[in-house]
Curated annotation (Swiss-Prot):
Record bears the keyword Manganese: no
Subunit organization: Homodimer and heterodimers.
Sites carrying sugar chains: N34
Highest taxon of source: Eukaryota
Annotated TM spans: 10-29, 51-71, 87-107, 132-152
Membrane topology: Multi-pass membrane protein
Alphabetized PANTHER family for the sequence: CASP-LIKE PROTEIN 2C1-RELATED, CASP-LIKE PROTEIN 4A4
Database matches in NCBIfam families: A_tha_TIGR01569 (TIGR01569)
This protein's name: CASP-like protein 2D1
Amino acid sequence: MAPLLKLLDSSLRVSVIPLSAATIWLTVTNHQDNSSYGNLKYSNIMGLKYMVCISAICASYAFVAAVSIWIKCLVNKVWLFFVSDQIIAYLMVTSVAAAMEILYIAYNGDQKVTWSEACTSYGKFCNGMKTALILHALTLCFFIVLAVISAYRAFSMYQPPVSSKETVEGDAT
């Protein structure tokens, strides 16, 4: 792998770790008590527990992958990185979507199922969730770039396919 690409790959993987840790910390410590409606915390909402779980998986994988890039025997396992990066990126997409939907409903409610918006009563909680979602979305962007890098590394090992025109010209000679 080119040194610049390896440095970018490592930097992104290392950057994902504190972003994921911050997402987890902001989500887990986020709670607000309301005298009318009671205490709201992340563990009351399944989608936020999912986001915390995916963030923990993401940070753990990023750490292992960042270390593995510098170990010679694992550098040649480009397909392992490619598949793993794709899986993590897709898991991140699902958790960002779930958290975004929760935040949307918290701000706007859903009149059809008689859910009222909650952010007027739990403004601090909603602001904390918004910050956590922004960090989680940034982590997703990093993993999309990592997925592209690992795809490039995996598929650049092969020659491009020969076009039918080149095949016909080769047969004529």
